[in-house]
C-alpha cells in the first residue's frame, strides 16, 4: 500500500471545505475515537458521502476505507481514493488481496472505515448486512467503533439547490466482539455482525432501523440507554 502525505492533506482540505460550504455537519461524541491504535469504523450507508465524512472528521492521518472496485472507472474518484490509500475491494467475489491489505493496515495501528451493508440503502433504513466487517475485526483483533449517520440521504442533491442539509455523525464507544468459534464460524460471524448493526441502529432514529427494527438486541440496547 502506497502513501501520499501531500495528496492526502490536499484531498482532506478540499473535501472538508466543500462539505462545510454545502452542508451543516453536526458531530457527536468524537471523543469516543482513540487517537492511536488500530480499529474498525463501521457506518450505516445511504450515500457516497458517508465514508467521506468519516475520513474528514476523524483527526488522524491513518484513516482510510474499503472502496468498491466499480468506482475505479471514474478517473477523478480513483485518484482521490488512491491519494488516501483506499483499499479497492471486488464485491463480486472473495478478494484475498483486499482482505490482506485491510488486516495489515489494522494490525499496524491504522483506521479502516467499512459499511457492513455493503451497498447503499435507497430509502435510508438499514438493509441486510454482510459479515465482512465482523470477519475483519476477528482476524485483525481490533475493536469496533459504530458510527450512525443521518441527513446524507439525498443530501448532496439538496445542497445543490442551495438548501444546506443538516447532517449528523454520531460516534459510539469502541467495543470488542467475542471470539469466533471455528466450529460454528458462520453463525458466530452473523451474531457479531448483528451486534455491530444493532449498535449503529441504537444511535439512529427509529425510521432508520429497517431490518433491525424488531431485533431483540436493538431493543435491549435502547432500554439500557433509556435507563442511563
Predicted segment positions?
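Generic beta-structure capping elements
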Residues: 30, 44, 68, 92, ...
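Catalytic core of membrane glycerolipid acyltransferases/transacylases, capturing the structured
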Residues: 20, 33-93, 101
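Short gly/ser/thr-rich secondary-structure transition/capping motifs
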Residues: 20-28, 150-153
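Non-catalytic C-terminal accessory region of glycerolipid acyltransferases
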Residues: 1-7, 97-228
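Short, basic, glycine/proline-bearing loop/turn elements
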Residues: 14-16, 83-89, 116-120
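A general structural signal for well-ordered alpha-helical segments in protein cores
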Residues: 11, 15, 51, 64, ...
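Short hydrophobic helices that act as membrane-entry/anchoring signals
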Residues: 4-23, 78, 82
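Conserved beta-strand scaffold positions in the cores of enzyme catalytic domains, especially
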Residues: 27, 65, 86-88, 144, ...
Amino acid at each position: 500500500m502506497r502513501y501520499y502525505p501531500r495528496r492526502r492533506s490536499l484531498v482532506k482540505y478540499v473535501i472538508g471545505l466543500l462539505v462545510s460550504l454545502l452542508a451543516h455537519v453536526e458531530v457527536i461524541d468524537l471523543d469516543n475515537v482513540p487517537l492511536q491504535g488500530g480499529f474498525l469504523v463501521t457506518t450505516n450507508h445511504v450515500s457516497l458521502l458517508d465514508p467521506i465524512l468519516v475520513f474528514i472528521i476523524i483527526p488522524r492521518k491513518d484513516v482510510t476505507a474499503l472502496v468498491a472496485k466499480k468506482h475505479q472507472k471514474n478517473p477523478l474518484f480513483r485518484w482521490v481514493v488512491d491519494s488516501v490509500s483506499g483499499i479497492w475491494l471486488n464485491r463480486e467475489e472473495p478478494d484475498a488481496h483486499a482482505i490482506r491489505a485491510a488486516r495489515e493496515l489494522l494490525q499496524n495501528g491504522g483506521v479502516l472505515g467499512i459499511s457492513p451493508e455493503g451497498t447503499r440503502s435507497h430509502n435510508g433504513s438499514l438493509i441486510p448486512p454482510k459479515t465482512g466487517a465482523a470477519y475483519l475485526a476477528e482476524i485483525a483483533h481490533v475493536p469496533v467503533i459504530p458510527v450512525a449517520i443521518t441527513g446524507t440521504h439525498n443530501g448532496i442533491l439538496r445542497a445543490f439547490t442551495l438548501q444546506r442539509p443538516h447532517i449528523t455523525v454520531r460516534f459510539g464507544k469502541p467495543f470488542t466482539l467475542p471470539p469466533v468459534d471455528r466450529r460454528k464460524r458462520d453463525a458466530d460471524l452473523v451474531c457479531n455482525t448483528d451486534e455491530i448493526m444493532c449498535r449503529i441502529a441504537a444511535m439512529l432514529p427509529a425510521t432508520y432501523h429497517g431490518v433491525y427494527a424488531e431485533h431483540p438486541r436493538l431493543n435491549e440496547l435502547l432500554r439500557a440507554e433509556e435507563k442511563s
